[in-house]
């Protein structure tokens, strides 16, 4: 930093020397040029010291700019007020130097860079001009807006969901008329979305084809009463069949988990599961009175009353009651 300050001080002193020579009424142009070159060289040294460490590309760019600046720093018409000789006899004339008063320009904001139209790459692509009051071309926005209007104007009354697998099958179509706009007016299970004016589009990624529709029609042919509409074997899933559940609260026999109160059926334990928030697990039992009976029950200890058990029965027995003195457990 000290080296930069010393070089800057020497350059400023050399510049003052040039100004002193210009203020004197002398005809010694050679000494003025020598002093000017010396001042320029000193300023170049200051510039090189400041640009050290900024990279070779930065230094090369600064050196080129300094060279252009030094070549156009002191033009000839700065020293010559009015040349006596003409262009034809320029070799035999002596230039008369007339000093000009120095003008101090106040510091202000840097001038704006003005670009010509020829410097722009393309008027439609890049044009450096002050922003005008005209609005941007609204064509793209109008296209998007009209497209959205075309989509949303078809379903102002609400949402209509259709779950129909084939023609003639029962469908479920709840309509929601809350006044809200929705671009979907009808959803069907075959992967298509249909609006009120019968224009449809297919959802991407959903399986389509006759096999999928036929399978869905077989599945939806079952009614809610657990009776299949076809005469062949029912294709309904067993998990979807509603099971009758009823819960009762009975007093516990002992503190053991395996001890449950007996009833009119024989039960066999086939598993247990921990309950969240309770230290006692839940035991699962199946009816062992008749093989293949679908009846199940699970027993758990009541959290509020540890002396009581909650017994939940699930499913119905497919046989008559068999009285037993005690239940069988494993």
From Swiss-Prot:
Keyword terms, alphabetized: DNA-binding, Nucleus, Transcription, Transcription regulation
Pfam families attached to this UniProt entry: Plant_zn_clust, WRKY
Domain of life of the source: Eukaryota
Coiled-coil blocks: none
DNA-binding region ranges: 256-322
Entry-linked SMART domains: WRKY (SM00774)
Gene Ontology MF terms: calmodulin binding; DNA-binding transcription factor activity; sequence-specific DNA binding
Chief localization: nucleus
Record InterPro entries: WRKY_dom (IPR003657), WRKY_dom_sf (IPR036576), WRKY_plant (IPR044810), Zn-cluster-dom (IPR018872)
Location in the cell: Nucleus
Signal peptide (UniProt feature, chain positions): none
Annotated function: Transcription factor. Interacts specifically with the W box (5'-(T)TGAC[CT]-3'), a frequently occurring elicitor-responsive cis-acting element.
Protein name from the UniProt record: Probable WRKY transcription factor 74
Source lineage: Eukaryota, Viridiplantae, Streptophyta, Embryophyta, Tracheophyta
